């Protein structure tokens, strides 16, 4: 699966200051004491790297940004088919995406909402608003409890919606505009 390749996810870091001749080009060992916190070294997505050899810290770009991708459309189609209990057509839609990524094909028996959500994150990591997807599929609370040890005991149904800013509520003078449940 090319989506997990070393090119697409940067896992290794190298010293790139040519003035530091003893370190230049050497792989950073994240257990070393360095000038930065080792907590800041983690796998990074290269799909948003815009640096150039002459300016590796380039943060801005005129590169076009994607709003919609064909793979996202196929994954939404698979979600719709799952909603109709048509796992074969859902698997066919997912396999369009997996084929492009060089991943193995799946069969209808493996097609579940959890598998589809995992496929979405493999394909759309860094692009989609994951929270909205998990709320839409009614999986936010289950996924947080399973994977987020920090807040797994704190998340509730209230957290599916965000509070409406008081200024918005106050600006609706001609109608009653209630706050979302749990935020009163």
Question: Where would I find each of the regions flagged by the language model?
Answer:
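A generic helix-loop boundary/linker signal
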Residues: 60-61, 87, 93, 105-107
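Flexible, polar/acidic helix-loop-strand segments at domain edges
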Residues: 1-69
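Residue-level detector of solvent-exposed, low-hydrophobicity positions
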Residues: 14, 20, 31, 42-43, ...
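Long, intrinsically disordered, low-complexity segments
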Residues: 57, 64-67, 98, 106-184
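Extended, hydrophobic/aromatic-rich amphipathic alpha-helical segments that build helical scaffolds
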Residues: 1, 5-6, 65-99, 113-123
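Short arginine-rich
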Residues: 102
């Amino acid at each position: 699966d090319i989506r997990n390749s070393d090119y697409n996810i940067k896992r290794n870091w190298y010293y790139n200051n040519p003035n530091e001749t003893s370190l230049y080009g050497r792989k950073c060992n994240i257990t070393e004491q360095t000038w930065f916190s080792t907590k800041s070294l983690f796998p990074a997505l290269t799909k948003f790297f815009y640096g150039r050899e002459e300016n590796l810290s380039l943060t801005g770009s005129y590169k076009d940004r994607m709003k919609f991708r064909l793979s996202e459309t196929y994954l939404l189609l698979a979600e719709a088919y799952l909603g109709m209990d048509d796992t074969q057509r859902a698997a066919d839609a997912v396999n369009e995406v997996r084929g492009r990524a060089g991943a193995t094909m799946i069969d209808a028996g493996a097609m579940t909402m959890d598998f589809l959500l995992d496929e979405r994150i493999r394909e759309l990591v860094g692009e989609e608003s994951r929270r909205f997807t998990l709320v839409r599929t009614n999986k936010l609370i289950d996924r947080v409890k399973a994977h987020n040890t920090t807040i797994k005991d704190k998340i509730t149904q209230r957290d599916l919606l965000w509070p409406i800013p008081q200024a918005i509520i106050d600006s609706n003078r001609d109608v009653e505009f209630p706050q979302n449940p749990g935020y009163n």
